[in-house]
Each structure stands twice: as C-alpha cells, then as structure tokens.
C-alpha cells in the first residue's frame, strides 16, 4: 500500500532533523526548470500570481534566487521533517525511529508543485509553489499540465516496486488533481474524516487535515500493508462508518474533538 499526502505551506528549517538518513528527489531536473522560470518574476508578480503578502513574496523571491540542485543536509532538509501544518501535526514524524522512517520511505509520498513527488527522506530546499498555481510554462497553462502523467507514472513504478496495487489517497483535491487516475495501475482508496457539528457530520478542514496525518501515522506505526486494516483506525475518537463508506471510499466519523 502506498499513501499520498499534500505538502504544507509552513516549513521548519530550524529544528534539527531526528534522522541523518537522506535521499535525493527524483525530479530535480524538472524542479530546476520551474525555478528558472520563477526567477524571472519580480516580487510583485509573485505576490499577484500566488496571492501572497509583500513580505512572503519577497521571501520566496529570495528562496528561488538561492535555490540550487546540489542538495546536502547543510542546505536542505528531509521533506517529511521540513513540512509543518495540520497534516504533519497529525503525522508527528519527530518521534519516528529509524524503522519507521524506513517503512515510510517505501509507503508514503508527498505531492509537490515544485518537486512533483517527494519521498519522506528526500532532501528539499524551501519553496512556495502550490499545485493549483496558474503558472504558464512550456508544457501548458498550469502546473497540472507541467507535470502531466509524470506523477502517475512515478506512483505506478513505486507500487510495482513494492509488489502492490493499492493507493491510499490522503491528499487534498488540489494535489490529487495532479494524479491521472485513469493512468494508475492501482486500486485507489479515498478517505473522508467528518466531525459532528450542529447535529450533522461535516468535513471540518482543520480536523480533516490532521486526521489524514494521523491515518498516515497509523499505517506507518502498524506497518500496515492490507487495506482491510484501515477500518480499525480509531485515533483521537474517530471510528469507521460502514453505513457512509463504500468499497473504495472510507468514511470516519467523530462525535467530539479529543485534542
């Protein structure tokens, strides 16, 4: 089973990594192509394109200028530890042991507007480029066109390498939109996490993002390979709803937040 999650806007390059193991991203040449294009934009253009404040636009212009593909532990950080945000709070990789990282490396990946796909231990230099950004490029009008079927091909190869055909989608619609479902040689399992609010179960973004991370953590810590075991997920009060679920659409409900 292979899991996909979204990246995060918030990054942490201050906290020392809890593992010294690292690998290199597999689409660095494509990332460099995008960086070269982004370097041509002024901070004002970046602000307008990405709807960022002047301060954030300036920060990312500086990031693009200093980005270079010789990734080392001194100028980059493992992706799973560099990303911060609700999904990564739920995942809590900071307390992983080496065996956890080893399993995650083969069974988890992060989709990225700049890097395409990142494995947990892939080094990453800081950036801001969301998949939904309408950055016109040589391959089309946006990043979905830029990545084309490359991400789907990567996922197929990763699944084949582990001898499996189950893809667990824990990513947002924005990012999973970069995956060509019809090109996947896999069974795709989608997930929904709903919380009770005003008498109805609803998807509440903050809680749902955190729950996706908790589900990824559950799979990693339990070394789960059989998707049937996903129904046993019960972190922080969530429980599987057979009534609302389908064969490839797993719905988890929660009656009250426990965090």
From Swiss-Prot:
Biological classification of the source: Bacteria, Pseudomonadati, Pseudomonadota, Gammaproteobacteria, Pseudomonadales
Protein name: UPF0246 protein PA14_18590
Family as reported in the entry's similarity comment: Belongs to the UPF0246 family.
HAMAP family named among the record's database cross-references: UPF0246 (MF_00652)
Naturally occurring in which organism (per UniProt): Pseudomonas aeruginosa (strain UCBPP-PA14)
InterPro entries for the chain: YaaA
Any one cellular-component term (Gene Ontology): cytosol
Top-level taxonomic group: Bacteria
UniProt GO BP: response to hydroperoxide
